C-alpha cells in the first residue's frame, strides 16, 4: 500500500457485480450536464473492489467491464452506474491520471448546446481536460485499434538488474496477468 501511494499514479481495477456491494471513495470530480446519465448506462448493484488499504492508496479506481456479450470488443463503456454512483472505466481513469485532470464532464441530451428536442436520447460525449470523447447513447466509445502491436514485457525481464527504468519514461504501464494465468485464480 505504501509503494502504491508513494508512486502517486497507480490506478486499480474493480469489477462490477450484482451480488457484491463494496464501496470505495471516488477520486475525481464529476460534472453532469443535461439528462441524468444514469438512465443510459449499464446498471450494477455493487462492485468487487480490492483491499480497502490498497484502494485508499491508489490515485484512481476504474471499472473493468467489457460491455458487448459476444467476446468481440468493439466498444468500451466509459462509465458504469454502480448503485447510482458513476464509476469510470479503468481506461478512462488511467487517462485522467496520465494527463493530470481532476474532473470528468458528462454531457447528455438536453444539455446546453446539445440538440435533442426534449427527447432523452442519451450521452453525447465525455470531456476530460481538453479532450472530448464522443460516445454512443449508452456512454460507450468505439475502440480504434492501432496497427502497432502492444509491447509486452515479462516480469522476469523487468526484475533483471540490467533492465533500465528509463524504458517506461513517459509511458503508461499496465501490469496484469495473461489470459492463461487467469485459470489459476
How would you name each of these model-derived features?
Residues 127-165:
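Protease-associated
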Residues 1-131, 164-185:
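Non-transmembrane functional regions of envelope-associated proteins
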Amino acid at each position: 500500500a505504501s509503494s502504491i501511494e508513494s508512486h502517486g499514479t497507480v490506478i486499480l481495477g474493480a469489477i462490477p457485480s450484482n451480488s457484491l456491494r463494496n464501496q470505495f471513495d471516488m477520486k475525481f470530480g464529476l460534472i453532469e450536464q443535461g439528462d441524468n446519465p444514469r438512465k443510459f448506462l449499464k446498471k450494477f448493484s455493487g462492485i468487487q473492489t480490492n483491499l480497502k488499504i490498497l484502494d485508499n492508496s491508489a490515485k484512481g479506481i476504474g471499472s473493468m467491464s467489457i460491455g458487448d456479450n459476444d467476446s468481440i470488443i468493439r466498444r468500451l463503456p466509459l462509465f458504469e452506474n454502480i448503485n447510482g454512483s458513476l464509476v469510470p472505466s479503468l481506461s478512462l481513469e488511467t487517462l485522467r491520471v496520465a494527463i493530470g485532470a481532476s474532473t470528468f464532464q458528462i454531457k447528455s441530451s438536453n444539455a446546453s448546446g446539445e440538440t435533442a428536442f426534449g427527447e432523452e436520447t442519451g450521452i453525447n460525449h465525455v470531456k476530460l481536460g481538453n479532450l472530448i470523447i464522443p460516445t454512443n447513447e449508452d456512454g460507450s466509445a468505439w475502440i480504434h485499434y492501432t496497427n502497432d502491436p502492444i509491447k509486452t514485457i515479462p516480469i522476469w525481464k523487468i526484475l533483471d538488474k540490467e533492465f533500465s527504468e528509463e524504458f517506461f519514461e513517459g509511458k503508461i504501464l499496465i501490469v496484469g496477468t495473461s489470459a492463461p494465468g487467469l485459470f489459476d485464480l
